[in-house]
Design a protein with these regions (language model features):
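Glycine-rich, acidic/polar active-site loops that bind/position phosphate-bearing ligands
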Residues: 1-175
């Protein structure tokens, strides 16, 4: 936790908008949420990773962003990406969100190809994932490729989508 707290402060000091940190399912697994728009979001993610590696060095530990750093019956490491546009946030409808999800399903294979190496080890259909070769979406469905948050539905379909397919080692410029 000390590393996570120091990392959070280092990112904030660097002008990177982190919106939270939390411990995850696997032992020693931590998550942080990075907020940004477009290319700035990708830039900030790379800098935040760099800061995390440097801080971990000072503690004599290593950071591992492999999608499944240890095989077994537990969750892997993903880089879930929330996204929205102005229409989704202010004039959304169930039809709009369904159409967007269907369009993402049409290019599922292309997305998977860009979402990080060894992602097949994580996207097995178990441990809050959809199988790498299948596409699905649903409200509050952590086992779907695309999760529609309850927040979005409760706010008259105004909100965002969460792409749960990218792995922790993904290149944010490709995603």
């Amino acid at each position: 936790r000390e590393i996570a707290d120091i990392h959070l402060q280092a990112c904030l000091d660097a002008g990177i908008k982190l919106t939270g940190t939390n411990a995850e399912v696997a032992l020693g697994q931590w998550e942080y949420q990075c907020f940004g728009n477009g290319i700035k979001a990708a830039d900030d993610l790379w800098v935040s990773r760099y800061l995390l590696y440097k801080i971990a060095e000072e503690f004599g530990v290593c950071v591992n962003i492999h999608p499944k750093p240890k095989t077994g019956d537990w969750n892997g490491s993903g880089m879930h990406c929330n996204f929205s546009n102005e229409e989704m946030r202010t004039n959304g409808t169930e039809e709009l969100f369904s159409t967007m999800c269907e369009k993402l399903g049409e290019v599922h294979a292309e997305g998977i190809a860009a979402y990080g190496s060894d992602n097949d080890m994580r996207l097995t259909g178990l441990h809050e994932t959809q199988s790498i070769d299948q596409f699905s979406y649903g409200v509050s469905d952590r086992g779907a490729s695309i999760r529609i948050p309850v927040y979005t539905v409760e706010h008259n379909w105004n909100g965002y989508l969460e792409d749960r397919r990218p792995s922790a080692n993904m290149d944010p410029y490709l995603v």
